[in-house]
Structure formats: structure tokens, C-alpha cells
């Protein structure tokens, strides 16, 4: 059983975090020329869309977004199930020489980010790839770090970070949850 342990971000803090990350992306990339955002399914997709919208509000110009399904790139595919559920990758633009920002909700072991890097490289050769996450919870198993982090939240391995999004969960909120024995 999982129970809520603490709230990390309420709706207001969540929105402020997305605004800050949007400004950081613009600043680090010296504007939005050749900039694209690609959300990692599932929760990275609405986050990428929201960041793109905020960047458009700031810069007055829209940027392209896509979505990435990393299922076949996972290194734990054989342990997931015999028939993994595949979703479509939708990147309706060339990534050649683009500044790609991968977007996900939580950075943990680094394995999802590694799979996403492999998936992007299969689409072409971008100028570079950056990573934006709402929460970095530590416990890396691979040498991967995010370029943009909403909040660093050190956790124990038995704790979970739950990023709730209005598009999926009906609310914007980040929680620490803990697995408890019944």
C-alpha cells in the first residue's frame, strides 16, 4: 500500500517551477532558434506542451514539440511483460541540427533518460540534447544529470515521487509517497 508522506509542490509552486524552467531553457539556449521540446511518455508529454506554451508566452513565438515512446529502448524490457504496450513516437519535424530538450517528470536512476537518448539519436543527429525534469530524486545508476531541474528531492529507495498533472490526474501537485506494509 502507498500513502502520502509530504507535499513537495502545490499548484502555485508547480506553475512557478514551470515558468522558471522555461526562462532557464530560453537563457541557456540564447533564445529559441532551432529549439524543440520532446516529452517522454507519459507525463513528460503534457509537461513539454506546457513548457512550450510558456516559452511562447515569453518569446512571442511558438516552438515545435514531439512525444517519445521509449518502450523498446528500455534495458528492463524483458522484465516488464511478455507483450509490452507500445505507443507511438510522434516527432513531426527533423531533429537534424536542432537543440533538443527532453522533458520528463522525475529523474531517478537515469535509465529512462538513457533510453530516451537512444530513441532520439535514432531519429537523427541533433545539435545537442538537454534534459528537463520537475523532480530529481537522486539514486542514479548511470552518469546522467538534468540540465533543468524544478526541485531536487533526496529520497530513500522505498519512497516514491508522484507528479500529478491536471491533464492526467485532474490536479497539479508533487508528492512524496511511501510504501507501507499492511
UniProtKB/Swiss-Prot annotation:
Keyword Transcription regulation applies: yes
Assigned keywords, A-Z: Glycosyltransferase, RNA-binding, Transcription, Transcription regulation, Transcription termination, Transferase
InterPro entries xrefs: PRibTrfase_dom (IPR000836), PRTase-like (IPR029057), PyrR (IPR023050), PyrR_bifunctional (IPR050137)
Documented EC number(s): 2.4.2.9
Domain of life: Bacteria
Molecular function terms from GO: RNA binding; uracil phosphoribosyltransferase activity
Motif (PRPP-binding) on chain: 100-112
Function comment: Regulates transcriptional attenuation of the pyrimidine nucleotide (pyr) operon by binding in a uridine-dependent manner to specific sites on pyr mRNA. This disrupts an antiterminator hairpin in the RNA and favors formation of a downstream transcription terminator, leading to a reduced expression of downstream genes.
Binding partners and assembly: Homodimer and homohexamer; in equilibrium.
Protein name as annotated: Bifunctional protein PyrR
Source organism: Natranaerobius thermophilus (strain ATCC BAA-1301 / DSM 18059 / JW/NM-WN-LF)
